[in-house]
């Protein structure tokens, strides 16, 4: 500091102090912050808005980490985040970190979103029919490719003949009978997914069911007396 004055004889005078040591910085906390914009619904994109974020010590390069119910989400380190099925029912936050102009590490965390809402995901894959479309053969509903992002529930089956449900045909297999000959068979698989939505898929139809020839049952008997002039009759009542 310099002190100056005019002495009693009218001469201007001044004296200057010794210099202090270098002034040390006091780290300033960030002001403003980060907010999340976007709709917290599956498949929507959330964005970290840092327009109000400031630091008297200078902002550095910003890094991002999104979290689900407080747990960091692997790989979610950009300024936006696309919500997935895993986020449904969870609250999302984002932390923004940086090194300020004085070398101090700083971070701010957004307020949490409301719980992420589900969007129904249609079934993937489907159901196919394995087996031969011939009378007396067994058809099987193959669901090995069936999947649902919302989680599969218990599977229910309904077999149909030319589009009409077959009474009692509600298992994963169906044995073809005479009534099926000449018709096309399908199977519908239904379930309630993990989010409570009723879903169903239907197989492609088989070719027309072919007939298998059956040997006759019962037979023919002769009634009457085997005597000259008597009449014999062919009895086919059991045929």
Residue ranges and their predicted role:
Residues 1-239:
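Ser/Thr/Pro/Gly-rich low-complexity disordered regions
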